[in-house]
């Protein structure tokens, strides 16, 4: 199967070369762009920059990002109408165009995407859908029957569906044939990679465990707080560092994390706001272990960033995460919601010698699969194939 897919993509590149088109490939990129910062928006930004830097492509951006806290319904509908009308105009005024659509994960997002796929289908432009998560099938199954049938019909018209790993192909089972479902690994911002190096972490008495994600229950943050409390009560010299969206910007009770810490007397946790650039890099460099005990995931960029930084990872076997590591030794898996297993996993990585040995394993995984060049080139091949289909 892998060989067949490689041969297919190779054929698409040959076709592109033989035609020798005089104008760039036009791509209508309908996706969530920063802000706000999320795995989806960072992935879209990376791809857009990669396409824009290539003279063979011209990109028209249509931003479907929503604030984490959400907006009133009327404001959301107005934004959708504006994007839909702009996309319709773009599709109508370009004879040859590929629509790249970043599919949503929820029922409301899929209703939005149904409208956008219909706009692309009207002038028969090929559509490539990219799913940066693992919840699409659940959201589809939760839709009312009539809407689910319409959504399924629209998805069946896709030229290709891109998922993040082989484990996530199941989202399109019974909708698309296997050869129209493509697994492409995420890529990391090249500016972040430039800051990474192979330096060993300093010798110190305590162990710093980094959580870098949104402060929401689905990311396992309250389970991690319970683990921090257990470590504190056991007298373990573990320091937990939380970096992410503050409570007032997410759909959760205000100051939920800080309130939880006060209520339970947790004193071994440091909290920092969202970090970017060198500031984010510094958090990784100052950590000994990275942790993300999520309830569900696609292929988290923060885990891949941690691998580039040479950090061992504690996480859950959800979504596409197991495909990141395979049989690697640089990961410790815990069950969703198990604070005691988190403490045990940290205990297993308490030796600095072990962590230093695993750093090489982590970096090998990152550099072999998750560079921005590998990601962008793989998506380009799909877009070329769609353009000349």
Model segments located where?
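Short hydrophobic beta-strand element within catalytic cores of glycosyltransferases
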Residues: 312-315
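Short, structured helix-loop element that forms part of the nucleotide-activated donor/catalytic region
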Residues: 239-267, 278-279
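Conserved donor-binding/catalytic core segment of Leloir-type glycosyltransferases
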Residues: 28, 200-229, 240-243
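Short alpha-helical donor nucleotide-sugar binding micro-motif in glycosyltransferases
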Residues: 274, 282-287
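Conserved acidic donor-binding segment of nucleotide-sugar-dependent glycosyltransferases
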Residues: 327, 331-339, 348-353
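Aromatic "clamp/platform" in nucleotide-sugar-dependent glycosyltransferases that forms part
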Residues: 295
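Donor nucleotide-sugar binding/catalytic pocket of nucleotide-sugar-dependent glycosyltransferases
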Residues: 150-195, 204
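A short, well-ordered alpha-helix in the C-terminal region of glycosyltransferases
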Residues: 354-369
């Amino acid at each position: 199967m892998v060989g067949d897919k490689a041969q297919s993509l190779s054929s698409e590149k040959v076709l592109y070369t033989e035609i020798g088109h005089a104008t760039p490939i036009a791509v209508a990129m309908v996706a969530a762009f920063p802000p706000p910062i999320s795995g989806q928006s960072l992935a879209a930004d990376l791809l857009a920059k990669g396409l824009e830097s290539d003279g063979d492509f011209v990109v028209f951006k249509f931003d479907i990002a929503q604030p984490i806290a959400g907006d009133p319904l009327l404001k959301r509908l107005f934004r959708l109408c504006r994007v839909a009308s702009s996309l319709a105009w773009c599709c109508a005024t370009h004879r040859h165009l590929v629509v790249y659509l970043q599919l949503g994960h929820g029922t409301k997002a899929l209703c939005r995407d149904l409208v956008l796929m219909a706009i692309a289908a009207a002038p028969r432009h090929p559509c490539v859908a990219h799913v940066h998560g693992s919840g699409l099938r659940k959201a589809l199954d939760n839709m009312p029957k009539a809407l689910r049938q319409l959504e399924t019909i629209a998805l069946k018209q896709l030229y290709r569906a891109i998922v993040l790993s082989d484990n996530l192909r199941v989202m399109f089972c019974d909708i698309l044939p296997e050869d129209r479902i493509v697994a492409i690994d995420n890529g990391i911002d090249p500016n972040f990679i430039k800051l990474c190096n192979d330096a060993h972490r300093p010798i110190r008495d305590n162990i710093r465990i980094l959580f870098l994600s949104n402060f929401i229950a689905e990311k396992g943050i309250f389970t991690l707080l319970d683990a921090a409390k257990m470590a504190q009560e056991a007298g373990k010299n573990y320091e937990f560092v939380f970096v992410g969206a503050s409570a007032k910007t997410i759909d959760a009770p205000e100051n939920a994390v800080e309130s939880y810490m006060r209520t339970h007397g947790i004193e071994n946790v440091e909290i920092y706001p969202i970090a970017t650039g060198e500031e984010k890099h510094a958090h990784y460099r100052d950590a000994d272990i990275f942790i993300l005990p999520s309830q569900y995931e696609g292929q988290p960029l923060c885990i891949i960033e941690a691998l580039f930084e040479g950090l061992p990872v504690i996480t859950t076997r959800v979504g596409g995460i197991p495909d990141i590591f395979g049989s690697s030794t640089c990961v410790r898996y815990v069950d969703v919601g198990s604070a005691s297993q988190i403490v045990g996993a940290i205990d297993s990585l308490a030796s600095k010698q072990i962590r230093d040995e695993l750093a090489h394993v982590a970096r090998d995984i990152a550099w072999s699969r998750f560079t921005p060049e590998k990601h962008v080139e793989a998506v380009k091949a799909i877009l070329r194939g769609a353009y000349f289909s």
